[in-house]
Amino acid sequence: NWFWSGGCIVNETASETLKKINSQVNIIPKNLDLTYENIEVVGKPNVILACTDNMESRFLLNDYALKNNIPFVYGVSVSDKGYILNVAKGRTCLRCIFKSSTEETCDTIGVLNSNTTTIASIMANETIKIILGAGYEKDLIRIDFWKNEFSKIKVSQNPKCPACLGK
């Protein structure tokens, strides 16, 4: 079932579905709380996608991707808003833009169903462009689903950003 697997772990369900689509793909689902102590489990993929539900994990993936020179696609869906940012060495990262891990979450305010599928589609498209070496989006993409507003926000790298400086 593509859309609902009640009681199942999402990453395992996604892995099974993707393997049905392409049996040649190598997917190793992991169900764990990502921390600075176990971040190496991510390995050295061609690209990292952050589909996590909290900013702390997103910052962790951001830092790991920059440290290891791995392109990183950030996407978030909460309430009726969605954001996507491609992070790579020498470009704006999450820590350049967001200063704190305090935020509204799907647990606290919910999420509009159409939001998640649209954000995931754009993230998939950006990932394909990265893998193919095509030009990919440099701006922060912001979508307000309630107002039907799609916008690109110019973002700048913070010259004092600890993640960008490798600290």
Task: State each model region's role.
Residues 1-167:
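Adenine nucleotide-associated cytosolic modules
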